[in-house]
Structure formats: C-alpha cells, structure tokens
Amino acid sequence: MKLNILRLLVVTLACASAFVVITKVRAEKTASSITPTLPQPAQQPAVTAAQQDKPTEQVQKNIKVLTGLPQWQLIPVMNYMAASMGRRCNYCHVNNNGQWDYASDDKQEKNTAREMIKLVLDTNKNTFKGNVEVGCYTCHRGRSQPQSIPALPLPVPSPGGGQRPGGGGPPAQGPGQQPQAQPSPSASPAQPTADDILNKYINAIGGTAAIDKIKTRVMKGSMATANGQTISYEIHQTAPNKAYELFTTQRGSMERAVNGETGWEKNPQGVHELVGQPLADLKLSLQLFRNIKLKEQFTRLRFGGRDKVGDREAYVLNAGTADNRRERLYFDAENGLLLRRVTFTQTIVGVIPEQIDFEDYREVEGVKLPFAIRVSSVDPGNPISTRKFDEIKLNAPIDDSKFNMPPKAATP
C-alpha cells in the first residue's frame, strides 16, 4: 500500500514538461476523429502516408522515451501533453526567430520531461499491471505544476449533505437516546437496456424503413474554428463505403476521399495516398451511417447510468469494439436523440478523449439529422470546432468519379 501511494505521489511530478522531440510533422488526428487535418505551414511538410504506422523513432529525430509509439499517435500525444499542462510547444522546444528546432536538447524542460515520462511508464507497468491508469492529466489538470496542497478555504458542505468530521455513519447517540430512524432510500427507476435506448433512437430519427432508403448524402455548410476562422465545408457520401470531403480555407483547399478500400488526400503539398492507420481513421469517420446505425459498430454495449448534456437529461451507454476501442454514447432521455459521442484513444502516456456533440436536429426526407456538430478535442490550437450545415440532401445523385484519386503532379 505504501509503495502504491509513493508511486502515485511521485507521479504528481510526471509530465512536468511533457513534450518530446518532434521534427517537421503534420497533425494526424486520433482514430475516431472527424476533425479535419487542415493544410499545415510550409515549415511543417507532411510525413508520408507510408511512415504513419512506423515507430516514431524511425521517422523523427532524437526520440528517446517514446520509442515504439506509432507515428500517427505522435501529434495527438503532444496535444494531450500540452492540454494537460496548459502549455504550448515552445515550453520545451527551441524556436529561433520563428524557426523550430524540435531535435534540440537545449531546454532543460524537455530533458526533465523525459524523466517524468519514464516515471509514468514505470508506474503504470509496475503498479497497475501495464494498464494506463496514470497520465499527465492525472495530476496536472491544466497546470504546468501539480497542486499538492489543498486550496483554502475549503467548500462549505451543504446542511445535512455530508458526513460527520472524523467518520461516516449516522450521528452519535447521547446517553439514554434511542437510535434515530434513517430515511430509506427512494426506489430507483427501472434502468433501460442498451437495446431499449438504441431502438428508441432509431425510432426517434425516423425508423428503420426510412433509414434503409438512404443511399447517398450530400451536406454543405461551414466550419468555425476556435480562433474564429470560418472554413467552407462539404461532404458527399455513397453507401456503403465511399465518401469525399472538401475544405476551403484562406490558405487554400484540401480534399480527402475514401473509395472502398483505398483513400487519398490532396492539399497544397500535393496528392497523397492514405494507408495504414490514417486510412483506417478516415474510413471510420466518413461512414455514411457512422452516427445512425450504431448497434452494428460495437461488440459490447451496456447501460452506464444517467448524466446531463447541457440542460438535457441523458442516458449513457458504454460501448466497446472488437479491436478494443472504447466509446461513450449519450442519448436524450426524453426524445431518444443522440446528443453526444465520446471516443477514447489509448496511448502509452494516457487516454486521449474526443467529444462530438450533435445539435439542431431537423427532418430531411423522413429522417432527423443534426445540422450542427461540435467537436471538442485536446488540440490546444483548435480545442473546439463547430460544423453548421446549410443544406443536407438525401439520395441526390453523386458522380462516382469524385471518389477517384487525382493524378499526382509530375516530378520536375
């Protein structure tokens, strides 16, 4: 017991400068992300698609403690560390007049970070049997230095709402007093099953017959980022496994598509075929029925209690997939609509969440669909982005050539 406590105390220092070396990389999102990878500054050329599944030490320079981390997880892990400490890249990395030297070890903060990451890895390995129970956020909670002393004054407990100082249980009885009757707990309402919740959702959005009529979907609108930038966005989807999306920004445009088992991306740096984890991510996120036919996506579903999403009471489902991805789904307890979807990506230094909120449901040809989708992530540069659609069309014709990969530019 003392050993466990000691290790947990040690971890309060963990990730104090938790950034490691990155050299010129482009952000790739987590496995369930629907947030776009936007064109990156010229200073950060893209890592090739073939490199994304390689260990990061085979792609980047001077990686010392995150050996074995897949390259595609590197940017999400960096974002997780930054969010955990409320810091940005320059806390650990060298920037000379706007030029990043990610491989440099000149800053002591980065060297300290390596030691702290080792402590996190060791604690999870030796205390929690290899499970990732402790991460940077465990202690930092958005601060560069963990707070180890309680802040005074402490919150005042509500009358009758807490235990007596020094222990729990009912109040002590005086001499000759009879024990006071304790109120019996109120009966808990019957818990719905996972099937109850999912069936109610299907009926709420229009029913199986209406859903099965959907063959294509075209959505057009805009995406607002956390820094106030507005990006034009559109997506074209054909069942069962084709999709194309276009982002238009002030810096240019970006296209991404899935055509069955293949995928590609076109940005200002050129056309790239997607393979490995980035392709799997895109195939998952662009599925036409991704947020409609939920039951088929999971091998494990169980009721997770009640919660609130905004001012709405919600039922929660804890879900798991065949490849051990975990998600949490929130459904409006009254009308049955899907309100929120939280996905979790496990890495060697912590579990990275992403939250997707669905709002402004409207009926389109007999099916209710959200016209606003808000994505919250641990990306410090864009923690919240909101997509709002001006139009959604079902079963509109889509030219199949839209999903084909464009020819690559000739090499000079």
Briefly describe each language-model feature range.
Residues 1-28:
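Sec-dependent N-terminal signal peptides
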Residues 32-197:
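Sequence context surrounding c-type heme c attachment/ligation sites in exported
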Residues 103-113, 277-285, 346-357:
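An anionic, turn-rich surface loop/hairpin at beta-sheet edges
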Residues 190, 210-215, 228, 349-351, ...:
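Edge/loop elements at the starts and ends of beta-strands within beta-rich repeat scaffolds
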Residues 196-271, 296-308, 321:
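N-terminal mature ectodomain segment of secretory-pathway/periplasmic proteins
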Residues 250-252, 310-409:
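Gly/Pro-enriched, hydrophobic low-complexity segments
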Residues 264-290:
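Acidic/charged, solvent-exposed loop-and-adjacent secondary-structure segments enriched in E/D, K/R, S/T
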Residues 281-318, 337-340:
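Short, conserved active-site entrance elements at the starts or edges of catalytic domains
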